[in-house]
Amino acid sequence: TTSKYGMKKPGSWGTQQDIVLMALDGEAWDNFLMTEEEAGLAEEAEKVEKEKESKDNNGKDSKKKDKKKGKADSEKKESSKKNDLEFADGRYRQIRLTDVSTLMGDYWLNKKGDKLYYTAVDPTGEMTLYMEDLKKNETSPVMSGVQAMEADAAGDNLFLITRGGGLTKMNLASGTKEPVAFEADYDRKPSAEREYIYSHMLRQVNDKFYDVNLHGVDWEYYGDHYRQFLPHIGNDRDFADLLSEILGELNASHTGAKCFAGDAELEVADLGAYFDDSSDGAGLKVSSVMPRGPLSRRNANVAPGDIILAIDGKEIVKGADYSSMLEGKAGRPVSLRIRKADGKEVTSKVKPITPGRLRQLAYERWVENNERVVDSVSGGKIGYVHVKGMDGDSFRTIYERILGKYRNCDAIVVDTRYNGGGWLHNDLAILLSGKEYVNFSPRGQFIGHEPFSQWTKPSVMLVCEGNYSDAHGSPYTYQTLGIGDIVGAPIPGTMTAVWWENQINPMITFGIPQVTSLDLNGRPLENQQLNPDLIIYN
């Protein structure tokens, strides 16, 4: 596959791919490029030639046949010499097989080389099996929900792993599909499973940790020491804690273990407001309403100072936990009885939101407040953006703001505080390090300059102790390249790439920091604190 033709996400977060064929034989290349009609005529001519040879051979005696066989063997040897792979011109014998770039999975070309089967993400986000007729240049979906595929040895059937782990056999000649029934029973012994995972973790760290000396830790000693607690552990959460304890002895970032618990049956929804905990009396006194939240809508009729007395007819008792009244209510109409600040009681219908949506709204409010502060103190001359994560979505957001709304500002504040990382340092550096070299001016009117897709004016980067991973790497890059000043609190050194490995128990995963970054002096950035140019704790 190649990413030559497809779209690329910022920060190496994935690219669309295509399947490309390279012919290492000139004759095979010519045959592949034949049209459907030309291929049919060639097959017919080959069939006629074989029939003619068969008739000729049947009319000769065995002696002549032996001579013929010897001659055929000689010709076969000559033919094998002719079929040596031709690498020299390989790059000129390449062709893009797929007609649309997408996120690719498995792929397989049939024996005749005229049909390509591949799995790719469809417009709805579903992994789908496609078949492309290379002679007719037509692509059609075959089956949705296909996670992986493999052809049998003869190339007559495809075996498909479908959504949910099912197995399907598809005959390529007829196109028929039939489920493959199978059983894979096993006896699970959780204690033995944990023993295995623990030993596996010890080996993996010893083999893959970025520092061959394991930060000077006596790993064998700690492995024996913590093993004594295994017999006393009876659940995944405690086991993950044990793994985290021993991995913590490495004094490294990007490690520890996680236990993925099942989702709660009934998630507690939220009304999207902050309440006055010091308020006397029953109900919830609203201190502020979250913008774009359920209570901010005009028909909700809720304002700071109002008191929510009941939810779906259930009274809110002073000091009591009201969360049970909102269990499973996200996105569903809820009735609120409200006492307005003037003493009048009203009833409103609202749709509570999920905790995740509440966090997003709170984040947006924080960013908007920061924007207002910077705009106010600078008189509109300085812009402000916050990089939420070192990922493609965050990059697109700040790219639009920096080169859109703030294009005419004199400077930009790039806030990376509380960023959990990702992989975006080079994209940020390119965006913020533009050097203006030409202006465009028809008839004396300025209309723009190059580079148009980079910020060419001053910038400053805000950081804090909460910057992690590539949110350490990005300020390091920014500071090392001299793009601008770093302002804020020192950042712990955590610019290291991690491999989170899922275990045979799918509820358990642990991390191994495999690749650290070295500064220009060859020192690991792991555990190397970054000091801002101007230290301000906030």
At which residue positions do the language-model features occur?
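Multi-bladed beta-propeller domains
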Residues: 24-49, 84-102, 133-147, 174-190
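A flexible loop/linker signature enriched in serine peptidases of the S9 family
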Residues: 1-73, 120-128, 162-168, 187-190
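Extended, small/polar residue-biased N-terminal targeting/export presequences
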Residues: 231-281, 343-369
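Terminal targeting/pro-maturation regions of precursor/exported proteins
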Residues: 173-245, 249-250, 256, 280-284
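Blade/loop signatures of beta-propeller domains
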Residues: 69-90
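Cleft-lining beta-strand/loop regions that shape enzyme active-site pockets
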Residues: 208, 287, 311-315, 319-508
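Conserved beta-propeller blade repeats
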Residues: 1, 9, 101-119, 141-161, ...
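PDZ/PDZ-like domain segments forming the peptide/carboxylate-binding groove
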Residues: 266-319, 392, 515-516
